[in-house]
Amino acid sequence: MSAPPAIRFGVYLPQVASSFAEIRDRVLACEAAGIDSVWFMDHLHPPGLPAVPSFEAWTLVCALAPLTSRIRLGHLVLSNSFRHPALLAKMASSLDVISGGRLDLGLGSGSYEPEHRMYGIAYESSAVRARKLAEGLDVVKRLFTEPEVTFDGEFYRLQKAVNVPKPAQKPNPPIWVGGAGGPTLRLAARFADGWNCPTYALGKLDAKLRALAAECEAVGRRPAELRKSIEAVLVTGRDEREVAAARALAERRYPGPGWGLHEGGFIGTPDEIVTRIRELAARGVDTFVFFFSDRARPETIDLFARHVLAGFR
């Protein structure tokens, strides 16, 4: 029997209302602390917020790649509607080479209709977006691995397209599909190296894992081949008083059920967080991507590294 996959930890750093220097410093602090990855959003305008500064997703990670040396870089998740998949494959291959093989490629169908309207980008029905994502994933994977690609799909067409250089990671950078609906789970089983459970589905994680396993088996794939990650708000402190203060901040910053703060989230002292991680790891989750309630201030990263991360190294 093969050993269970190592548990990996990432930090989600929404690039909103922060200067580039602030984002850079927090990424470097995460790298110094031994955190495995940092993840960013892909929005042209932050959902539900006024006109606050935010950095475009790819521009940001390309700027961070040469400033870092070990930490992995990714997005949860890129919107398939923002970029043609052939262009995305070229961008991803280039960044994977530039970063020395440190890219994780998260891809989804695009979910925020007002943003699409704002920028004049077509926003089709969920069924159409799912079919487009399926074709997009197929195109990206083939351009990562094949010398020449001709593709004649419903939405995308390629004629003897080449993609050189190929990604540094072989056969491709890890591809993550994020979302919790049936069509998304089906696409993860068909195309992805990993599935990401979003915050809003944490309370239904067991049901989603069972559904994902069924989709894997339907395409002749062992469910254990697919990595599983969750993203969640993490609320912690050195003692109960600090936890209460951090929770109050998180309640203001991440209100409502969509953030998963109460639906299976992570609230407690470091020992309680470790216990919760071990519970989910036993159910098959191998990657944990956390939103810190204070947006990953250095002292919080240090606390997490010394009292949570250290328990898994």
What feature does the model see in each segment?
Residues 1-313:
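Active-site-adjacent structural elements that line small-molecule/cofactor binding pockets in enzymes
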